[in-house]
């Protein structure tokens, strides 16, 4: 490590000196031109000298021949001839020079060629002395030699004495500085038109390999080397040059840098963001229409998605950061608007970039703008003033464009209903996310949320359809409930169901239950309450004892039966509403049984599981119960259907003429409530000293509010809490308890629990039924539907239950069921009773000979006691 | 007519002389008042003379010429009268009136038209010119102190007069030169004595500040800079010369602080940022973005010194190339040197004398100051000796051996004979390696000798700094054994500056400069801080670069 660091020290400054050599090139070239005249003279002198040398060597060779002849040794002759041939060279380029060491007082002899580079000289010195080449400085005639020049360039001749010197240099990352120096030097030479092999990409990889990991401060200092050296500007300048080779080299280098940035761990990637932003700004000026700029901008967008340390990276420059990324956000939003207008997009990737820029911009605005949010336009001087004005215009454009898009969606949906089989366009997939961004913008400006609400209400059909189609589990949809008025039942139901885990129907994951019909409630209780929430999240596998059947049909029957037991008033768990017998609320008297609180938790789980499995159990909740589950306050109008007598009494109290009311001494009322519970009468004070407090025209509103709360909410507080806990167990993790019910209205929950309010439509039923073994024109089929129409609604539901284990039809009718219904032909005796496979919605009947016999058989299975068993025949 | 003119001027002169002699013995305050009255009278008489000359000649041109001369004369009188009145009790009071009386004939003579009078004027002019210099210097110092525009104008006129005297007669010029040589003995400081000012370090710039402060203590270099300052240096072609020119101009601006030549107290000028060197630094380190503020790293001071000397040398040669005469002489120097080399090579085989190769600077003003010549002789067994002469700007001294305790030891080691390994007698032949030895001696000394003590080195642990103490004297007498041959050059050098690196390793540290002023006082320049120090502190043994000036 020490060696590597020291090596970089020398290389850094040697690279620096290379630039200074470039500055002095003109002077040296001129001197070379001046000396060219002398070269001619030297040549003539050299020729004269050569002749003399040749004559001298001829004599010498003759003497050596004589010597060798006398001694009789042939080897001497060979050696002699070799010398002659080498002596005949016109001029030798070999040099012998002396290098004085930096320490130790020693001089070494170096053999070199005249046209060797100084770099090669450094390597020879390194070979002899083990001093790294990058660590060396060589001085001759007062000059420090530059590596890329030749020895001849410095007029180094035979027996020249050179001085080797070391240096001091302070830098925290010497290898990094050396790497950056090499990059800059290469770029400089390429920009001047030199044809050399580029090693910039290798240097970039080397630079990235050495990024420190200890602390944010060290990372920032290290990466600042890249910025302080102006490498981004140099690379962009190289990219903008006219030479195609330079352009392609710069392009690959920039792309390599960007890909390395994206691959870094997060804390290092955060500090690369300013450099990528610098690249974006430079490329936007130089070549805004080219592909490299788009690549760079996209990289910046993807890095902004995970950028979570703005204070560490930008510190007090956070406002500047906002100003700098705003042009890119504007650019991308412009592209988005174009795609929306042409109905050609945007794709997920395109939208993701806009979103990431917006998230960072929003943070900057929230932190740096002096005015409280929402902002009232026109505004006085503040930070990011121009950007905020521009953003408001973008908000207007986006709102208008999305309005057009939503109208287009509605037209497509209308065409689809008529009969056009066109499916939803893939270009609609990002509309919901775009609306979310528009909502985020509307938080900044006063009155903007109102504009968005108007637009969404106008396009309610489109908005709801988009929600049902594209709202996914795991995303954040909380913003949609700010515009609840713009959604319909299907959209709200979809959003509520997203809170449940997905049922996989994997047998390995299912929770198995084996239930004895005679002990339905107690055994179901143990199976459900005894299980962990995780086990139940995988779904239920239901089987009745002594019966062969399994599958979703059995499960649906179980849900219906167990709810019938739970909500049976005889079990004292729930009470029917006084006016609407279909609605239930917890029974205040249920606290008598010590085990009953657990049963409310059990009930919460069962209701949640039924909703999760999309089974209509036919039970409705009272409005008061629903409001408590949603965490909302109960008002006078809410008890209208629960207790009409009390509703009318309270209404009279509030609407009575004040003078008349007071003259009658408040009808003799005080702040007390008389209750009867299990035969025991009691008087409860609504507030401290309630008995002594008379009701008058001024406090009668308070009296009514306290009365309602004490009468309806307080008695079942514990039961509601237990139910809510059980219900929440079935939701996905980290979901707030009341969020499910907050997403719905009471009518929505009614539709999910009981299905449609209307009587069963026989025509709808028939339209969703297919036949096997029968033709639609057969007389038995005609008889079947005629008989069904003559039955009562209760008998029809019994037939449906026998057929599918569903007693109630979903809100949207039979198309809401998981599959079509089927009538199969039994090839057995013609007088047999019908059979059914509820799992597959299959009813099997023989070919009855007469309509009378068919009617008799169908009415038989419509009786309740007959239809409640499997496989007993 | 002409006789009348002579009569009028002569009578005034005699009258003035008589009144002066009459007043001198008494030396009473009342007499000084009489002097003022006398001067007024003289003025009125001159006006009368002007009128008479106009009336007699009838030419406007002559009248105008007389008018300008008289106005200058009147201002001189005002200047003379004020110091006389202010220095009533001064001993020099007696001298000033004499000078005043002598000055009047000068102007009277200048008014003369007859040739006979002009001949006598020349001799008088020579005498007067010699004496006017002290007056000008005194006025200059006074004007510096009082900063009065009137005095500044008068001082500039004095300078103009001096210049006229220079250009008018070559003999008077020679007299002036001799007088300049005598100035040090008279202990009068020269005009260009800069106030010491600190240099602000805006971030890792102490190597620049230390180098500049050291160079300012080399008076031949400062003279070169002053010469450069007068020229119009193109900044694009010669960034280093332009930077130094601007640097000298910045130093030449008088600062608000006054100078007191006191050993214990020094009032330095306001420190400033050497921003004019930003271009030079950019050339020195092209990779560093912020060269002047927030510079990310330190540099080697000796490396920077070599760099700027190299750059200045090249830029000065470039300026010379604009003149054809210099080009001719340049080519002749190159050819003559090579001719000598060739002759020696051809004689070699026939004789036993050494073969000598010579490399030399193309001479520039910079190499004349800092440049010298080294001669190295290689003696190999079985072959003739080989000598090589090459120039140097700095001497790089090895201080690592234990035997080196001071500069003398380092110089001795520098010129000691050493054995060579791997030496080949004939590069072109295939003869084997023979034993050889090599020695280096100084053939020509430089006016400023820069000694670079090589403290930074590379060892088994990597890059290192040698913290060893090396003693160096205030006066250095070079040993003759370090020289090739005896010469008329002086072997005496005196220390003028040192650059010191403070720190324990080569990766960090700080640079300071100790520099000697002309009055012999030593100052320590630590970036913006300037403090006086004693010679004991100067002679600490941790110096990195030493600057010695030839005496």
Swiss-Prot record, chain A:
Keywords: Cytoplasm, Lectin, Transferase, Ubl conjugation pathway. CDD domains: HECTc, Ubl_AtUPL5_like. One of its GO terms (molecular function) is carbohydrate binding. InterPro entries: E3_ubiq-protein_ligase, HECT_dom, Hect_E3_ubiquitin_ligase, Ubiquitin-like_dom, Ubiquitin-like_domsf, Ubiquitin_dom. It is found in: Cytoplasm. It holds the Pfam family ubiquitin. Residues 1-37, 70-90 are annotated as: Disordered. Induction: By jasmonate. Down-regulated by hydrogen peroxide. PROSITE patterns: C_TYPE_LECTIN_1, HECT, UBIQUITIN_2. Disruption phenotype: Accelerated senescence. Its EC number is 2.3.2.26. E3 ubiquitin protein ligase that regulates leaf senescence through ubiquitination and subsequent degradation of WRKY53. Belongs to the UPL family. Interacts with WRKY53. This is E3 ubiquitin-protein ligase UPL5. It comes from Arabidopsis thaliana (Mouse-ear cress).
Curated annotation (Swiss-Prot), chain B:
SUPFAM superfamilies: Cysteine proteinases. Keywords: Hydrolase, Protease, Thiol protease, Ubl conjugation pathway. It catalyses: Thiol-dependent hydrolysis of ester, thioester, amide, peptide and isopeptide bonds formed by the C-terminal Gly of ubiquitin (a 76-residue protein attached to proteins as an intracellular targeting signal). Residues 329-338 have a biased composition (Polar residues). One of its GO terms (biological process) is proteolysis. Residues 197-551 form the USP domain. GO terms for molecular function: cysteine-type deubiquitinase activity. Residues 51-104, 163-188, 329-349 are annotated as: Disordered. InterPro entries: Papain-like_cys_pep_sf, Peptidase_C19, Peptidase_C19_UCH, USP_CS, USP_dom. Its EC number is 3.4.19.12. The active site is at residues 206, 510. PANTHER family: UBIQUITIN CARBOXYL-TERMINAL HYDROLASE (PTHR24006), UBIQUITIN CARBOXYL-TERMINAL HYDROLASE 10 (PTHR24006:SF687). Belongs to the peptidase C19 family. Recognizes and hydrolyzes the peptide bond at the C-terminal Gly of ubiquitin. Involved in the processing of poly-ubiquitin precursors as well as that of ubiquitinated proteins. This is Ubiquitin carboxyl-terminal hydrolase 24. The gene is UBP24.
């Amino acid at each position: 490590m020490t060696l590597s660091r020291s090596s970089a020290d020398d290389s850094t400054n040697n690279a620096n000196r290379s630039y200074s050599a470039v500055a002095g090139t003109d002077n040296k070239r001129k001197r070379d031109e001046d000396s060219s005249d002398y070269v001619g003279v030297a040549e003539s002198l050299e020729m004269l000298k050569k002749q003399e040398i040749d004559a001298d060597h001829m004599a010498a060779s003759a003497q050596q021949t004589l010597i060798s002849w006398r001694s009789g040794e042939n080897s001497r002759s060979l050696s002699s001839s070799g010398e002659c041939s080498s002596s005949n060279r016109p001029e030798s380029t070999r040099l012998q020079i002396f290098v004085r060491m930096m320490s130790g007082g020693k001089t070494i002899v170096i053999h070199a060629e005249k046209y060797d580079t100084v770099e090669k000289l450094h390597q020879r010195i390194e070979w002899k002395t083990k001093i790294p080449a990058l660590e060396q400085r060589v001085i001759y005639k007062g000059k420090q030699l530059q590596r890329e020049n030749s020895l001849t360039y410095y007029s180094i001749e035979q027996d020249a004495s050179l001085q080797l010197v070391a240096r001091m240099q302070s830098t925290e990352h010497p290898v990094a500085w050396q790497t950056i120096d090499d990059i800059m030097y290469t770029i400089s030479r390429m920009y001047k038109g030199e044809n050399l092999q580029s090693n910039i990409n290798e240097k970039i990889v080397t630079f990235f390999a050495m990024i420190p990991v200890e602390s944010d401060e060290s990372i920032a200092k290290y990466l600042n080397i890249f910025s302080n050296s102006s490498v981004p500007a140099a690379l962009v300048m190289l990219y903008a040059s006219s030479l195609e080779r330079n352009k392609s080299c710069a392009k690959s280098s920039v792309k390599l840098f960007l890909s390395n940035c994206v691959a870094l761990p997060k804390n290092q990637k955060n500090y690369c963001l300013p450099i990528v932003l610098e690249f974006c700004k430079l490329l936007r000026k130089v070549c805004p229409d080219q592909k490299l700029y788009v690549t760079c901008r996209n990289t910046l967008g993807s890095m902004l998605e995970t950028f979570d340390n703005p204070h560490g990276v930008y510190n007090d420059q956070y406002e500047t950061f906002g100003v700098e990324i705003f042009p890119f956000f504007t650019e991308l939003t412009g592209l988005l608007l174009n795609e929306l207008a042409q109905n050609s997009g945007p794709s997920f990737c395109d939208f993701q970039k806009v979103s990431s820029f917006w998230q960072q911009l929003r943070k900057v605005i929230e932190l740096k703008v002096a005015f409280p949010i929402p902002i009232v336009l026109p505004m006085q001087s503040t930070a990011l003033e121009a950007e905020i004005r521009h953003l408001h215009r973008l908000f207007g454009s986006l709102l208008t464009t999305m309005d057009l898009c939503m109208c287009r969606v509605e037209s497509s949906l209308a065409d689809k209903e008529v009969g056009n089989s066109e499916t939803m366009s893939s270009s609609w997939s990002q509309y919901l996310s775009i609306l979310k961004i528009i909502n985020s913008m509307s938080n900044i400006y006063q009155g903007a949320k109102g504009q968005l609400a108007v637009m969404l209400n106008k396009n309610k059909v489109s908005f709801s359809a988009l929600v049902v189609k594209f709202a996914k589990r795991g995303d954040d949809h909380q913003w949609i409930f700010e515009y609840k008025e713009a959604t319909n039942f299907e959209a709200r139901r979809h959003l509520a169901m997203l809170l449940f885990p997905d049922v996989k129907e994997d047998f390995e994951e299912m929770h198995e239950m084996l239930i004895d019909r005679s002990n339905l409630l107690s055994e179901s209780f143990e199976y459900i309450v005894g299980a962990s929430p995780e086990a139940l999240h995988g779904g239920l596998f239901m089987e009745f004892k002594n019966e062969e059947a399994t599958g979703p049909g059995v499960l649906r029957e179980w849900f219906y039966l167990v709810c019938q037991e739970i909500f049976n008033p005889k079990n004292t768990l729930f009470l029917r509403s006084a006016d609407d017998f279909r609605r239930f609320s917890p029974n205040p008297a249920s606290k008598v049984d010590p085990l009953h609180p657990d049963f409310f938790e059990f009930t919460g789980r069962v209701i949640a599981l039924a909703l999760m499995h999309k089974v209509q159990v036919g039970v409705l909740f009272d409005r008061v119960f629903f409001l408590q589950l949603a965490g909302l306050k109960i008002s006078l109008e809410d008890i209208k259907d629960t207790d009409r007598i009390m509703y009318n009494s309270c209404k009279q109290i509030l609407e009575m003429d004040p003078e008349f009311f007071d003259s009658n001494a408040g009808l003799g009322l005080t702040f007390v409530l008389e209750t009867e519970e299990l035969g025991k009468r009691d008087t409860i004070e609504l507030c401290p000293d309630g008995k002594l407090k008379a009701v008058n025209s001024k406090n009668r509103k308070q009296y009514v509010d306290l009365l309602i709360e004490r009468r309806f909410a307080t008695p079942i507080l514990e039961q509601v809490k237990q139910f809510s806990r059980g219900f929440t167990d079935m939701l996905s993790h980290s979901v707030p308890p009341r969020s499910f019910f907050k997403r719905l209205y009471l009518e929505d929950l009614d539709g999910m629990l009981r299905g449609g309010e209307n009587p069963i439509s026989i025509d709808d039923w028939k339209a969703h039924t297919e036949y096997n073994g029968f033709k639609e024109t057969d007389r038995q089929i005609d008889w079947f539907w005629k008989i069904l129409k003559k039955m009562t609604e209760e008998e029809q539901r019994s037939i449906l239950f026998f057929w599918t284990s569903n007693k109630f039809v979903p809100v949207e009718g039979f198309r809401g069921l998981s599959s079509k219904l089927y009538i199969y032909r039994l090839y057995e005796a013609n007088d047999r009773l019908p059979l059914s496979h509820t799992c597959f919605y299959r009813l099997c009947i023989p070919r009855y000979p007469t309509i009378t016999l068919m009617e008799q058989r169908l009415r038989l299975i419509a009786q309740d006691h007959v239809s409640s068993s499997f496989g007993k025949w | 007519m002409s006789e009348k003119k002579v009569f009028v001027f002569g009578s005034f002169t005699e009258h003035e002389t008589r009144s002066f002699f009459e007043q001198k013995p008494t030396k009473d305050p009342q007499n000084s008042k009489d002097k003022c009255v006398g001067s007024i009278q003289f003025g009125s008489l001159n006006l009368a003379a002007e009128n008479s000359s106009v009336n007699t000649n009838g030419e406007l041109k002559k009248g105008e010429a007389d008018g300008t001369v008289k106005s200058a004369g009147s201002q001189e009188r005002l200047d003379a009268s004020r110091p006389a009145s202010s220095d009533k009790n001064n001993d020099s009071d007696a001298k000033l009136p004499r000078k005043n009386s002598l000055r009047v004939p000068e102007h009277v003579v200048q008014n003369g038209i007859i040739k006979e009078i002009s001949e006598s004027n020349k001799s008088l002019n020579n005498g007067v010119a010699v004496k006017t210099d002290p007056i000008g210097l005194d006025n200059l110092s006074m004007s510096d102190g009082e900063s009065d525009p009137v005095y500044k104008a008068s001082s500039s006129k004095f300078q103009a007069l001096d210049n006229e005297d220079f250009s008018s007669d070559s003999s008077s010029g020679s007299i002036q030169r001799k007088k300049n040589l005598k100035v040090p003995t008279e202990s009068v400081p020269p005009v260009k004595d800069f106030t010491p000012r600190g240099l602000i370090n805006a971030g890792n710039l102490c190597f620049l500040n230390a180098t500049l402060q050291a160079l300012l203590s080399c008076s031949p270099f400062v003279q070169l800079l002053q010469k450069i300052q007068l020229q119009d240096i193109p900044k694009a072609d010669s960034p280093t010369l332009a930077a130094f020119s601007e640097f000298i101009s910045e130093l030449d601006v008088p600062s608000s602080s006054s100078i007191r030549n006191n050993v214990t107290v020094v009032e330095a000028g306001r420190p400033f940022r050497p921003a004019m060197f930003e271009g030079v630094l950019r050339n020195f380190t092209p990779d560093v973005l912020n060269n002047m503020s927030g510079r990310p790293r330190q540099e080697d001071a000796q490396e920077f010194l070599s760099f700027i000397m190299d750059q200045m040398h090249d830029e000065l040669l470039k300026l010379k190339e604009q003149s054809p005469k210099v080009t001719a002489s340049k080519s002749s120097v190159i050819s003559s040197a090579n001719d000598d080399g060739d002759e020696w090579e051809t004689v070699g085989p026939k004789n036993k004398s050494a073969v000598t190769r010579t490399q030399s600077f193309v001479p520039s003003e910079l190499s004349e100051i800092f440049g010298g010549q080294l001669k190295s002789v290689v003696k190999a067994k079985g072959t003739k000796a080989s000598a090589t002469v090459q120039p140097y700007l700095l001497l790089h001294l090895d201080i690592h051996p234990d035997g080196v305790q001071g500069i003398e030891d380092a110089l001795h080691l520098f010129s000691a004979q050493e054995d060579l390994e791997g030496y080949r007698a004939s590069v072109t032949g295939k003869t084997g390696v023979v034993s050889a030895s090599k020695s280096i001696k100084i053939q020509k000394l430089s006016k400023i000798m820069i000694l670079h003590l090589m403290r930074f080195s590379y060892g088994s642990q990597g890059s290192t700094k040698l913290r060893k103490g090396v003693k160096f004297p205030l006066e250095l007498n070079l040993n003759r054994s370090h020289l090739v041959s005896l010469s008329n050059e002086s072997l005496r050098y005196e220390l003028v500056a040192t650059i010191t690196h403070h720190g324990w390793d080569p990766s960090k540290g700080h640079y300071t400069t100790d520099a000697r002023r002309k009055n012999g006082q030593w100052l320590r320049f630590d970036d913006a801080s300037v403090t006086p120090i004693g010679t004991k502190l100067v002679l600490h043994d941790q110096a990195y670069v030493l600057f010695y000036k030839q005496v």
